[in-house]
């Protein structure tokens, strides 16, 4: 009986997870390049649309001098509403045309995009495709490793299997710029790696 190599075994068994076991130290996992290409080709162009840029710019004007304490209060209020099922902030966000646009792009992805949201320059959600766990992203890597560093790179988080769906997922985030190339916010998508 012929022996299969590690890569052939992973391919033959259809287990993307096996590829993670054989990633050399210091090398990025196999899914990172695939996710980066998907985001660069299909997600970034949808975020560069005037509807999204304008919505972010409007919120930046509205919350121009918001304090960190105020952002934390907004975030705690949002989280409490989600926990109680009293979704006033969520409903207001979901009623925005930018949220409806992001939801349509998620739906068009045929299960590849599981979540899609954009933030302002503080990390506060501007638009979202569904209920997020929190309203302020400014204290998380998805914001700190993109907007806070003025990076043009796509930050891709660690892949994890969602316990409820059993899908292998990762989040990818990048800076959104205005027409002059000035950073104004961020975009984040949760990607079902199994769907790529």
Pin down the residues of each PLM region.
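Bacterial N-terminal signal peptides
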Residues: 10-22
């Amino acid at each position: 009986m012929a022996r299969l190599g590690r890569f052939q075994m992973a391919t033959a068994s259809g287990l993307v997870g096996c590829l993670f076991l054989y990633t050399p130290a210091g090398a990025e996992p196999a899914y990172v390049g695939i996710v980066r290409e998907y985001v660069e080709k299909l997600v970034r162009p949808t975020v560069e649309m005037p509807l999204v840029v304008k919505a972010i710019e409007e919120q930046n004007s509205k919350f121009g001098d918001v304090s960190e304490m105020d952002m934390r209060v907004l975030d705690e209020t949002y989280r409490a509403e989600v926990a109680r099922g009293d979704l006033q902030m969520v409903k207001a966000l979901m009623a925005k045309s930018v949220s409806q646009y992001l939801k349509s792009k998620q739906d068009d992805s045929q299960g590849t995009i599981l979540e899609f949201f954009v933030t302002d320059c503080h990390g506060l959600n501007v638009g979202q495709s569904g209920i997020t766990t929190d309203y302020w992203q400014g204290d998380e890597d998805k914001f700190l490793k993109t907007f806070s560093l003025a990076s043009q790179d796509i930050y891709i988080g660690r892949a994890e299997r969602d316990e409820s769906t059993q899908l292998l997922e990762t989040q990818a985030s990048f800076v959104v710029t205005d027409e002059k190339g000035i950073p104004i916010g961020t975009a984040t998508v949760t990607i079902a790696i199994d769907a790529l």
